[in-house]
């Protein structure tokens, strides 16, 4: 019997997403994130359609998927405050601080987190780490500032790599930063955001997850 790692990971992502959906309450304004784990959440939302008053999406990709299932997606400017925002992460530490942005939607995701009363992060066990930084840190950058920002990141000890053929939903570019050991996520998030030309970076420490729902390799759910 062959062990298919991808299929098993997909099952865990679906397990975490299904568990998170149980937090959906009646007349809720729901924020929906971006990425492969959220893809399973979107599929699960059809079972909660009667409870959802309004849906806000963090990316054009998620908006397309939601509309394909018959959901009306509302701009955050009209929705106001989000009751619950559910999203995945590329890494999560013991303090529920995250690295996000592998799908290049980090700025809109960070806006949704800021506007949400509660943020639930859904992950499989492979995303849990002691120290953030193994996954390259995405930074959204104004295009004309790309080289300047890259030079400033080098001064901080990082190795920036331009993510080619990627334009964010906001019309910007992504630098993925390698070789950063992020011992103080809060400090680095603030420091990077102060570089002129940076829109935002993928550290979520100023507003970490309120709750993390993690599916373990033995198909159990752990709530952090």
Swiss-Prot record:
Pathway: Carbohydrate degradation; pentose phosphate pathway; D-ribose 5-phosphate from D-ribulose 5-phosphate (non-oxidative stage): step 1/1. GO terms for cellular component: cytosol. The keyword Cell inner membrane does not apply. The active site is at residue 109. InterPro entries: NagB/RpiA_transferase-like, Ribose5P_isomerase_typA_subgr, Ribose5P_isomerase_type_A. Gene3D superfamilies: 3.30.70.260, 3.40.50.1360. SUPFAM superfamilies: D-ribose-5-phosphate isomerase (RpiA), lid domain (SSF75445), NagB/RpiA/CoA transferase-like (SSF100950). It is an enzyme of class 5 (isomerase). Substrate binds at residues 34-37, 87-90, 100-103, 127. Signal peptide: none annotated. GO terms for molecular function: ribose-5-phosphate isomerase activity. Its EC number is 5.3.1.6. Keywords: Isomerase. CDD domains: RPI_A. It catalyses: aldehydo-D-ribose 5-phosphate = D-ribulose 5-phosphate. One of its GO terms (biological process) is pentose-phosphate shunt, non-oxidative branch. Belongs to the ribose 5-phosphate isomerase family. Homodimer. Catalyzes the reversible conversion of ribose-5-phosphate to ribulose 5-phosphate. This is Ribose-5-phosphate isomerase A. It comes from Francisella tularensis subsp. novicida (strain U112). The gene is rpiA.
């Amino acid at each position: 019997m062959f062990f298919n790692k991808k299929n098993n990971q997909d099952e865990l992502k679906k397990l975490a997403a299904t568990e998170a959906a149980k937090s959906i309450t009646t007349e809720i304004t729901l924020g929906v994130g971006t990425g492969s784990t959220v893809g399973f959440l979107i599929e699960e939302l059809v079972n909660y359609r009667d409870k959802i008053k309004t849906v806000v999406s963090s990316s054009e990709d998620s908006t397309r998927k939601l509309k394909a299932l018959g959901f009306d997606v509302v701009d955050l400017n009209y929705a106001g405050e989000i009751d619950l925002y559910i999203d995945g992460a590329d890494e999560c530490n013991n303090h529920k601080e995250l690295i996000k942005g592998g799908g290049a939607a980090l700025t809109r995701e960070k806006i949704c987190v800021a506007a949400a009363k509660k943020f639930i992060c859904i992950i499989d066990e492979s995303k849990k780490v002691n120290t953030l930084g193994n996954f390259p840190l995405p930074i959204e950058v104004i295009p004309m500032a790309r080289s300047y920002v890259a030079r400033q990141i080098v001064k901080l000890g990082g190795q920036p790599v331009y993510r080619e053929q990627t334009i964010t939903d906001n019309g910007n570019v992504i630098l993925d930063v390698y070789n950063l050991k992020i011992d103080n996520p809060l400090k680095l998030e603030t420091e990077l955001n102060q570089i002129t030309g940076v829109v935002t970076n993928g550290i979520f420490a100023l507003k970490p997850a309120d709750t993390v729902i993690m599916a373990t390799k033995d198909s159990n759910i752990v709530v952090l």
